[in-house]
């Protein structure tokens, strides 16, 4: 009988440590070679993509649209340092541009591509609200984003090869918006945003001004009210949960913090020998607060001010539409026509901030503790850029330049502080970037998009738009004639003062009391109203090209009639509804 023998198990190495390092080093180049080969043979090939992209670029040139996003950054970087470009000849990226008439542009551009013989041409809603995508042969080629006429003509650009690309520092606002949304953007966007922001600021650095802000001091009475908002009104712990200090007051907070550090007069990053940071402190023209409980906080603030002002009859309230994608609604409360406070709607966002505690000794020897929340350094930097843009739209030259100086001073103070303390931008100081602690409730973009579609469906509104030229041109001429892209409606995000009562969020009764306007309607504007409103561009080159403010329009009721103009859905991201825009 044979004896059972147990064989000793032996193992062998497949990759040595040295081989692992070699593969890690060389694999990216091998992958890149494979991607280039794939782009040349897989449909749609890189050659087809390039040809289609040239058609789109010609459209952008002819219609003077404004390109933003990755393509705009790539072209701007190439002008300064081609090595900093984020794309190469074999990298393909869709192109994004702003338009005051995005639906009309979508239809026209789809028709051009279809008539040139390209297959599977389709335009449809993108995932971002008021943005539309064009696909050709199942490939995404461009996103067209609605921009109010007033905003569109106010966007500064650089022209390259006949195409207007958004100014790099206008692009910076978008990157700052990403880093100021820690709960919804960190996982997917922060790494890319930081890399792009680094290259942008390296090639297009922030201008260094040697000036103080020239903001007039408000009347003493207004200063008193501004101070009491902070020391009395915001001392309420409940309000502290929903209010964040922003604007020039937040700017002063960071300047003072940098000035309190030792040896603040020595500056390594700014290449200057002497500076007194206390000179950067600016007059606060009015308080600026961001509220994550907007409606209640506006009413509470108004009621507080009515209690402390000398003459209640002199209080007034102005409301403003959201400014593009940058801010929500805002309310300015004035006394004797002098602004005391501007409150911005921050609902739906979790806003990064710095919490502070200040103890003050009272006359009777007792001590009072004040706790405040200031928006984070990166957030106030973003707000200064947005306010600078708003001042440009409003043709407010003094404040336009003041905000430019404030941006310069804020960055300078931060650099001084970090150099002299030996801290980094990620160390736990008030200048810490990429903060994850935030105030406010938010939801993911995908969830918000789905909830928005559900709400539209409940209201009987059109939930999606798909345009396929191949299907459209098969219809009879009478049906074709009903298509009217100019009936597309968009939210009023002009940033203008709200003049029509039915669009106001608040109502002041005959006794001066404030309440919600329960009959408030959401203001919309059509493409036809955008184009008929007109705009003119200032020739004052000492400032910037700037449009005249377009008047607020009173839109008609939303379009109810619709027809199908597509029987094919070339992308599964959209809803099943294929409603269109038609003439009555």
From Swiss-Prot:
This is Putative poly(A) polymerase catalytic subunit. Polymerase that creates the 3'-poly(A) tail of mRNA's. It is an enzyme of class 2 (transferase). Keywords: ATP-binding, mRNA processing, Nucleotide-binding, Transcription, Transferase, Virion. InterPro entries: APMV_polyA_pol_cat_2nd, PolyA_pol_cat_su. It catalyses: RNA(n) + ATP = RNA(n)-3'-adenine ribonucleotide + diphosphate. Belongs to the poxviridae poly(A) polymerase catalytic subunit family. Highly divergent. Its EC number is 2.7.7.19. Residues 522-584 are annotated as: Disordered. Its main location: virion. Pfam families: APMV_polyA_pol_cat_2nd, Poly_A_pol_cat.
